[in-house]
Amino acid sequence: MIAELRQYTLHPGRRDELIELFDREFIESQEACGIRILGQFRDLDNPDRFVWLRGFDSMESRPKALNDFYTGPVWKANSAKANATMVDVSDVLLLRPSAPHTGLTAAQDGSPDSVFLLTLYLRDQPFDEAFLAGFDRTVRPRLPSEPLACLQTEHAENNFPSLPVRSGENVFVWLARFKNVSQLEDWTRPDAISLSRQELRLTPTAGSRLR
């Protein structure tokens, strides 16, 4: 499985407009092209950020699936409306599971008030078995439930260059679900991993299958 983590910066006040359009037009139409829409989210701490993930069976299947969607009728009919809400869509990571059975699937339901913590670690060298063992020892036991996904940079060349992705980076991403904002706020973050990181507190959109 190959995943894209996409963080969009939007024009002020236009996030709900894009979400309504996305949930209505861009889920089934992408999946008809062989793309798995894994989840769509609002960033609780940035009202102008929209975060979503999509998946592909493999790097080899990715270019055809994307070409079929972006040259297809649904994107052509709605691209101008979508693009009008966006300031920057270049913050995109190409990811793969860090170990067997750590990829993300959309068929995972939580509580109606679920909130997600998406954490990105960055370092100079690739994330290796020693790091993964340390994560399993220090972070995983402190989570309220098993991480929904643990992913890391896919270093293969971007084979759909008309959609840029971040390159030359080593990123490890994990996604966890909490019952509500209070549970997340009460959670004590382990400090054993002293790496540069980004944390996103996310709530699913109405159309997100990951909830």
Set out the residue ranges of the language-model regions:
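Short S/T/G/P-rich N-terminal loop/turn motif that feeds into the first structured element of a domain
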Residues: 1-51, 55-76, 80-211
